[in-house]
Amino acid sequence: MVKKTLLTILCCILFPLCINALEGSEKLLFEKNSLYQYISVVEDSAKKERYIRNNKRDLRQGGIYLEAPDKLLFEYSRMAFVSLAFLERDPTMVLFVGLGAGSMPKYFNKYYPDAVTDIVEIDPDMVFVAKKYFNFKENEKMKIYVNDGRLFIKRTPKKYDIVFLDAYQNDYIPFHLTTFEFLKEVRSRLKEDGVVVSNILSEYNNKFFDSMVVTYRKAFPNVYVFQGQESRNFIFVATMSGKMKVQESVMADARKIQKFRRMDIDLAGIGESCEYSTAYERKTAKILTDDFAPVNLYKYQKSEAR
């Protein structure tokens, strides 16, 4: 009896079931413990939304509006496209590290159909989920590569205008995608005026956020921070250009892109939250390296005094 009870407890720990945390209007469509993470797909009939969720019910990794599947459901995904305002031309080559539900690359492909859109995703089960439950479809210009993001960047000969980094999971951060050495590899795959945009799910006052700021500042000439209003997300935009861009210029260029491309997100409004990274820098913060990157510990530790 004791062995049976212990086995039941162990199974619950190793294979957490999302269905116990569902609300009345939610329906579980899919769940699996992949080689890399727990994945569930949940549909909310009241909100008319479908999303990917891990075993913590309040954390969602990607999703769609059922009645408007081309619109971006989450604030961070809308915020990331402010990076377009830091490129002085239309992008022709972009890379997404991390697929999720596929909403961001699909959105980009809709408004820039002539650009090459590469997506690298380590988890083949996530690719399956994006295609089956979120209507993600590859096309001539948009391709998925099942690989580790860092290995792909290290080996590809391509040069990109924008690299979107969105591979940080809600409850686990792959440390090798946070370090100075990794960001140097990303730099090597950017064109001369290229841009990196990174989704950072973090509280403002913890050591992980502090270390990400100083690590990006060491790797790139200019780093800008955008803080979400609806969520805990921050967006970092790092540029190869040595010329600093002021908030008014970001807003003006964002407004032009939004109007010309007829995008359904308020890029100019997002640009209004632009701050230079020095506003967030702490002298005590540690630069993340391949030899020192305790990111999954740091995210639970409060910042030290400035």
Residue ranges and their predicted role:
Residues 185-247:
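C-terminal substrate-binding/active-site "lid" region of AdoMet-derived donor-dependent transferases
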Residues 8-17:
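Bacterial N-terminal signal peptides
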Residues 45-46, 71-198, 204-207, 213:
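The AdoMet/dcAdoMet-binding core of the Class I SAM-like
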Residues 13, 33, 44, 109-111, ...:
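A generic structural signal for short, solvent-exposed coil/turn residues
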